[in-house]
Regions:
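Fe-S-dependent hydro-lyases/dehydratases of central metabolism
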Residues: 1-891
Length: 891
C-alpha cells in the first residue's frame, strides 16, 4: 500500500505534559536504511516527503530516492516539496495579491468557485520595501519619511488591507515595523511548527518559501527556506507543491575563530567569494565544523542571508544549543524552545560536535584567516581587502569610464552657505541598512562604539556624505539607545530614517541638489558604502557608479573619510581637535568592548516591540477599506490595475505554438541581474514609464519607484529592461534600455520596439551570457518580458529563481551548448530565430534553434532545454503556473 512508509513512521513525542504526533525519521530508516549521515537540510526534505506521501504527488519511490542520495551524494529526481508557510514583502507582495484578485475574477468568469482562491497555508506579508530616505541627518527624518511613505503608498496600502480581510490565513505586518527577514528571524520563525489536526497536536519542521531572495536568512535559525518568484509563491500558498530536483549539498566547514577586529560582515564576504568561485547555483550549502560552537546565531543569519549572492538555494545551519539560546533571547516561549530541542534530537536534525555528514563536495575556512573586507564596486562576490580598496576603486574608475583619475578635478559647490570641493571618488552615500547586518547586534554595537570614539575626538562626517540608519527592527533602536550610542550616531548624521530596506534596494532617495549638480558637472565617479547585500550597477542611486558592501562600523568610518581613494589601514580618517591625525585603528572597538555592549540586548526588548506587531501606526489604523471578496478596480489608478495575464484564458490550454521568425529584442552580456531586467528604483521622466505616468496626470515628484508600481502592469512593462546601466550589445556605446527595431537601424526604447513588433505579430527573443537573471527573486523580470512578447531566452546559464520564473510565465529558457556563446557564433542581434516542435519538448532535451543571418545564411544551434522537471513542463504547456492552478481549481 502506498501509504505504508508514512504510516509506519508515525510516532509520538512527549514534551513536558504535551504529546505531539510526528513522522519519525529513525522509524522510517528501518525501511530506508541508515540515514545518520544524510545532511541535516536533506533530513528536513525527507520528513516533508514522508508527511505528504499520498502515492500521487509524493510516492514511496521519491522517499527512497532521497534516502539513497547518500550512496553517491547526488540524485536525478524531481520531488514535490510543500513548505509550511509563505513570507512576502510589499514590492513582491502587491503584485502577488493583484494576481490572486485577478485569479478570482478569472475563476468567476469561467464558472468556478472564487472561495477556492485562498491561501491553504499561513502567509505573512511584511511592508518594508516602500520607505525612502527623503530626509536624513536630523531628528525629524524618521517621522517625515514615514509621512511621505504613507502619502505616496496610500492606494497600495488600502489594497493590502483589503487583501488581509479578503483572503484567509493572510496577515500583514504594517509599515514602520521592520524588514521581513529580520521580523521572520526575531519573531515569525518557529524552527519547529505545531498545529492541531483532528484533535491531535502534530509537530514538523518550520519551512517556508518567500517572495524575496534573502528569505534564506532564516536558515541561520535552522529553518529551511529560500526565495521563489511571486508566481511560484502564489501557487504554493494555493496548495501547489514546489517542484524541485533533489539538490546536491555542498558542505562548508568552519573552523577556528575570527581574529580581534574582524566582523561577521568580513566573514560573510569571504564565504560569498569562496562559494561563488566553487559554484553552488541550484545547490544547498550546509555549514558544519567546530567553528559553529562559538559562532553566534546573528552571525549565522548574516551568512545565510547572502545565499543568493553566493548563488546557493540556501545556506543551512542545523539546530543546536546556540539556536535555543537565541530563541530564548528573542522572546520565544519556553514551551516552544523545549519542543525545538526535543524534536530536533529525536529526528537526528540536531547538530552534535564532530558531525561529518556526507556532502556532494566540501570547502573549509579557518575563520582566523579572514581579513577586514569590502565587496565592490558592482558585484557582491568581488571581495576586496580593506587596504586594497583605493586600488580597486581606481581600476574600476578607469575601466568603466575610460579615463584616469587625475583627469577629474574636484568640483566646487555651495551648500548651506558654505563652499566645498567635491572630489572624484567621494563617498556620497553611507548607509547602515539591510537585514544582512542590522539583525546582528555585534556589528551594530561596533558602529555605535566607533561613532562614540570619533565624536569624542572631534571627528565629523564629510559634508557631501548622505548618512542614514535604517534598522531591520525596532529592537535595534532599543539596544543602541540602551547602550548610549544613539546620540553619537546622530551627531555623525546616522539618524534613524525608517525601519525598512531603504538604500539596500535602491530607496536611497535624492542626493542634495548641489551634490547631484557637481557630480554631473565634473562627470565624477562617486561611491556608496552600505551594510547591505547587493551593489549592482545603478541599484543604489543612478548617479553613483561604484557601490561597496561593508560592515556597519566601516560604513561610519567611510562617512568620516568621505573618499574611496583613502586607504583606511594607513591614511588618517581626519584630525582631532588638536589637529593631530586620527586613524581607523585609534577608534576601532575591541572585541571586549563589543561583547560588553551586546550584553545590553534583552528579551524584554523583543517582547515590547513584537507585542503588537500586526497593529501598525495610527495612520495605518485609519485606512478605510471596502469589505468584499473581489476587489473594486479603479480604471484611473496608476498603482493597482487588473493584470492582463488571464485575459482570454480558457478552461483547457491551447497547444504550445512554435516560434517562427522571432526577432532579438536584446543581446546582453554576463551577470545580467533581475535589477537590469526590471529595475526597482527611480523612474526617469523621459522613459516610457515616466511618459506614461505623466500622461495620466502624475507629477514627477509623485512618481515613486518601479518597485512601488508593481501592481500596475502598464508601468512595469514599460520599465522592463529600463535600467539606466543595462548595455544592449545591439546598440554599442549606448547605456540604458534601448534597442533597434529590425530590420531598421534607428535606436529606440526597448518598450517602443516591442510594441511595434507586437503590431507586426513578430515573436521576440533575448540572447544573454552567463548567470542570466541573478539577484532578486523578482517575478516582474519574467512578467515584463512576457508582456513585451518575448517567447524565448537563450543564455549561457541561468540563475535558479529567474529560470523558474520564466517557465512560470510561459517563456522558454534555453541554454547554449558548452563552449558556445553569442560571441563564438558571431551573433549581431540581426538574426531571425525559428524553434519548432515545441508541443513535444521534454525536460532537459536538446532543442534545435534555427538562426537565419541577415544575409540569409542559416545555422542550427543545439541548445539545452532548461525546463528541468515534468512539473515545470506542465506549467509551460499551460502557458504558466497560475493558469495551471486555475484550471486545477475548475476541475
Amino acid at each position: 500500500m502506498s501509504s505504508t512508509l508514512r504510516e509506519a513512521s508515525m510516532d509520538t513525542l512527549q514534551v513536558k505534559d504535551k504529546t505531539y504526533r510526528y513522522y519519525s525519521l529513525p522509524l522510517a530508516a528501518k525501511s530506508l536504511g541508515d540515514i545518520t549521515r544524510l545532511p541535516k537540510s536533506l533530513k528536513v526534505l525527507l520528513e516533508n516527503l514522508l508527511r505528504w506521501q499520498d502515492g500521487n504527488s509524493v510516492t514511496e519511490d521519491d522517499i527512497h530516492a532521497l534516502a539513497h542520495w547518500l550512496k553517491t551524494a547526488h540524485a536525478d529526481r524531481e520531488i514535490a516539496y510543500r513548505p509550511a508557510r509563505v513570507l512576502m514583502q510589499d514590492f513582491t507582495g502587491v503584485p502577488a495579491v493583484v494576481d490572486l484578485a485577478a485569479m478570482r475574477e478569472a475563476v468567476k468568469r469561467l464558472g468556478g468557485d472564487t472561495a477556492k482562491v485562498n491561501p491553504l497555508s499561513p502567509v505573512d506579508l511584511v511592508i518594508d520595501h516602500s520607505v525612502t530616505v527623503d530626509r536624513f541627518g536630523d531628528d525629524d527624518a524618521f517621522e517625515e519619511n514615514v509621512r511621505l511613505e504613507m502619502e505616496r503608498n496610500h492606494e497600495r496600502y488600502v489594497f493590502l488591507k483589503w487583501g488581509q480581510q479578503a483572503f484567509s490565513r493572510f496577515s500583514v505586518v504594517p509599515p514602520g515595523t521592520g524588514i521581513c527577514h529580520q521580523v521572520n528571524l526575531e519573531y515569525l520563525g518557529k524552527a519547529v511548527w505545531s498545529e492541531l489536526q483532528d484533535g491531535e497536536w502534530v509537530a514538523y519542521p518550520d519551512t517556508l518559501v518567500g517572495t524575496d531572495s534573502h528569505t534564506t536568512m532564516i536558515n541561520g535559525l535552522g529553518v529551511l527556506g529560500w526565495g521563489v518568484g511571486g508566481i511560484e509563491a502564489e501557487a504554493a500558498m494555493l496548495g501547489q507543491p514546489v517542484s524541485m530536483l533533489i539538490p546536491d549539498v555542498v558542505g562548508f566547514k568552519l573552523v577556528g575563530k575570527l581574529r580581534e577586529g574582524i566582523t561577521a560582515t568580513d566573514l560573510v564576504l569571504t564565504v560569498t567569494q569562496m562559494l561563488r568561485k566553487h559554484g553552488v547555483v541550484g545547490k544547498f550549502v550546509e555549514f558544519y565544523g567546530d567553528g559553529l560552537d562559538t559562532l553566534p546565531l546573528a552571525d549565522r543569519a548574516t551568512i545565510a542571508n547572502m545565499s543568493p549572492e553566493y548563488g546557493a538555494t540556501c545556506g543551512f545551519f542545523p539546530i543546536d544549543g546556540i539556536t535555543l539560546e537565541y530563541m530564548r533571547l528573542s522572546g520565544r516561549s519556553e514551551e516552544q524552545v523545549e519542543l525545538v530541542s526535543a524534536y530536533a534530537k529525536a529526528q537526528g536534525m540536531w547538530r552534535n560536535p564532530g558531525d561529518e555528514p556526507v556532502f556532494t563536495s566540501s570547502l573549509e575556512l579557518d575563520m582566523g584567516s579572514v581579513e577586514a573586507s569590502l565587496a565592490g564596486p558592482k558585484r557582491p562576490q568581488d571581495r576586496v581587502a580593506l587596504a586594497d580598496v583605493p586600488k580597486a576603486f581606481s581600476a574600476s574608475n578607469e575601466l568603466e569610464v575610460n579615463s584616469s583619475l587625475k583627469d577629474r578635478q574636484p568640483v566646487d559647490y555651495t551648500m548651506s552657505g558654505q563652499q566645498y570641493k567635491l572630489p572624484d571618488g567621494a563617498v556620497v552615500i553611507a548607509a547602515i541598512t539591510s537585514c544582512t547586518n542590522t539583525s546582528n547586534p555585534s556589528v551594530l554595537m561596533a558602529a555605535g562604539l566607533l561613532a562614540k570614539k570619533a565624536v569624542t575626538l572631534g571627528l565629523k562626517r564629510q559634508p557631501w556624505v548622505k548618512a542614514s540608519l535604517a534598522p531591520g527592527s525596532k529592537v535595534v533602536s532599543d539596544y543602541l539607545a540602551q547602550a548610549g550610542f544613539t546620540p553619537y550616531l546622530d551627531e555623525l548624521g546616522f539618524n534613524l530614517v525608517g525601519y525598512g530596506c531603504t538604500t539596500c534596494i535602491g530607496n536611497s532617495g535624492p542626493l542634495p541638489d548641489p551634490i547631484e549638480t557637481a557630480i554631473k558637472k565634473g562627470d565624477l565617479t562617486v561611491g556608496a558604502v552600505l551594510s547591505g547585500n547587493r551593489n549592482f550597477e545603478g541599484r543604489i542611486h543612478p548617479l553613483v557608479k561604484t557601490n561597496w558592501l561593508a560592515s556597519p562600523p566601516l560604513v561610519v568610518a567611510y562617512a568620516l573619510a568621505g573618499n574611496m581613494n583613502i586607504n583606511l589601514t594607513k591614511d588618517p580618517l581626519g584630525h582631532d581637535r588638536k589637529g593631530d591625525p586620527v586613524y581607523l585603528k585609534d577608534i576601532w572597538p575591541t572585541a571586549q568592548e563589543i561583547a560588553r555592549a551586546v550584553e545590553q540586548v534583552s528579551t524584554a526588548m523583543f517582547h515590547k516591540e513584537y507585542a503588537e506587531v500586526f497593529e501598525g501606526t495610527p495612520e495605518w489604523k485609519a485606512i478605510q477599506i471596502d469589505r468584499a471578496d473581489t476587489y473594486g478596480w479603479q480604471s484611473d489608478s496608476t498603482y493597482i490595475r487588473l493584470s492582463p495575464f488571464f485575459d482570454g484564458m480558457q478552461a483547457t490550454p491551447d497547444p504550445v505554438q512554435d516560434i517562427h521568425g522571432a526577432r532579438i529584442l536584446a543581446m546582453l552580456g554576463d551577470s545580467v541581474t533581475t535589477d537590469h531586467i526590471s529595475p526597482a528604483g527611480s523612474i526617469k521622466p523621459d522613459s516610457p514609464a515616466g511618459r506614461y505616468l505623466q500622461s495620466h496626470g502624475v507629477e514627477r515628484k509623485d512618481f515613486n519607484s518601479y518597485g512601488s508600481r508593481r501592481g500596475n502592469h502598464e508601468v512595469m512593462m514599460r520599465g522592463t529592461f529600463a535600467n539606466i546601466r543595462i548595455r544592449n550589445e545591439m546598440v554599442p556605446g549606448v547605456e540604458g534600455g534601448m534597442t533597434r527595431h529590425l530590420p531598421g537601424t534607428e535606436v529606440v526604447a526597448i518598450y517602443d520596439a516591442a510594441m511595434q513588433y507586437q503590431q507586426e505579430n513578430i515573436p521576440l527573443a533575448v540572447i544573454a551570457g552567463k548567470e542570466y537573471g541573478s539577484g532578486s527573486s523578482r517575478d516582474w523580470a519574467a512578467k515584463g518580458p512576457r508582456l513585451l512578447g518575448i517567447r524565448v531566452v537563450i543564455a549561457e546559464s541561468f540563475e535558479r529563481i529567474h529560470r523558474s520564473n520564466l517557465i512560470g510565465m510561459g517563456i522558454l529558457p534555453l541554454e547554449f551548448p558548452q563552449g558556445v556563446t553569442r560571441k563564438t557564433l558571431g551573433l549581431t542581434g540581426e538574426e531571425a530565430i525559428d524553434i519548432t516542435d515545441l508541443q513535444n519538448i521534454k525536460p532537459g532535451a536538446t532543442v534545435p534553434v534555427n538562426m537565419v543571418r541577415s544575409d540569409g545564411r542559416k545555422e542550427v544551434i543545439l541548445c539545452r532545454c532548461r525546463i528541468d522537471t515534468a512539473t515545470e513542463l506542465t506549467y509551460y504547456q499551460n502557458d504558466g503556473i497560475l493558469h495551471y492552478v486555475i484550471r486545477n481549481m475548475l476541475n
